[in-house]
UniProtKB/Swiss-Prot annotation:
PTM: Contains 4 disulfide bonds.
Tissue specificity of this protein: Expressed by the venom gland.
Record-linked InterPro entries: Snake_toxin-like_sf
Annotated family: Belongs to the three-finger toxin family. Short-chain subfamily. Acn-esterase inhibitor sub-subfamily.
Biological role: Inhibits acetylcholinesterase. Has been described to inhibit both the slowly and the rapidly inactivating phases of potassium efflux.
Keywords: Disulfide bond, Ion channel impairing toxin, Neurotoxin, Potassium channel impairing toxin, Secreted, Toxin
GO cellular component, one term: extracellular region
Disulphide-bridged cysteine pairs: C3-C22
Protein's name according to its UniProt entry: Dendrotoxin A
Example of a GO MF term: toxin activity
Amino acid sequence: TMCYSHTTTSRAILTNCGENSCYRKSRVHP
């Protein structure tokens, strides 16, 4: 599962991975 957010792509990735779990990781691992 690709769970990584940067800026605008984060939204696209988060939706594919799950805004809940991904969002948390993205904040810790930008």
